[in-house]
Amino acid sequence: IQSVDDIIARSLKYSDLAVSMGIGAIRTHVDTCDDQLKGVQALLEVKNSVKDYLYLKLVAFHQDGLYRDPSALENTLRALDMGVDIVGGIPHFERTMSDGARSITTLCEVAAERGLLVDMHCDETDDPMSRHIETLAYETQRLGLQGRVTGSHLTSMHSMDNYYVSKLIPLIAEAGVHAIPNPLINIMLQGRHDTYPKRRGQTRVRELRDAGVLIGFGSD
């Protein structure tokens, strides 16, 4: 069982490696499923240790889903109280589509109340009916969070029909929601239930970019 010190040691080692490769800023998702919040404790310590040479921002990420775990919301709020910077979520991992939408509403309201950014693992699936990015764009506008919200992965857009996407992308752009594709991991994870042809599972980068959506590639 890993300790807080174990996580600190690995994270400091990685931070030094990142800086040696010319990286000056990192946004990382810290797991809040652990009731002891060991990862949160560790990465807040690391953030303070590297602040003079690495801009480190932490996302509170309950990867088991906000409504699948009774302690999820409490742990997320505790992590934010401790100093984690950004509100995260994973709506497509909830038990139902409606729970996924509800989780987006709850987490965006938390961010709005606290003046924080949002970074959601959103629609990381091959299911074209996973459309949580639409809800994320709506809540962004409803709560006045334009420019402060990011949808990560967005791989279901690879499988959506073009008619729906022609509506969706303008909504994303209108809301000022940013996109972070993670191509190296999604080319491995997506399409794993396919036979042939296999989907590559990449979101629609060119269409998003052409619509004015700010895009930054990530690594998962």
Where are these regions (language model features)?
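Short beta-strand segments at enzyme active-site cores
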Residues: 23-29, 57-58, 119, 217-219
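Conserved short loop/turn motifs at secondary-structure junctions
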Residues: 29-34, 62-64, 94, 124-125
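Histidine/acidic residue-rich metal-binding segments in metalloenzymes
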Residues: 38-50, 68-150, 154-178, 195-215
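Alpha-helical scaffold segments that flank or form the walls of functional sites
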Residues: 1-29, 37-49, 74-81
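Active-site mouth loops of central-metabolism enzymes
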Residues: 1-9, 59-71, 91-98
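C-terminal helical cap
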Residues: 18, 178, 183-199
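Conserved SAM/AdoMet-binding glycine-rich loop
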Residues: 53-55, 59-62, 153
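Short, conserved beta-strand edge motifs with alternating hydrophobic and charged residues
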Residues: 59, 152, 180-183, 216-219
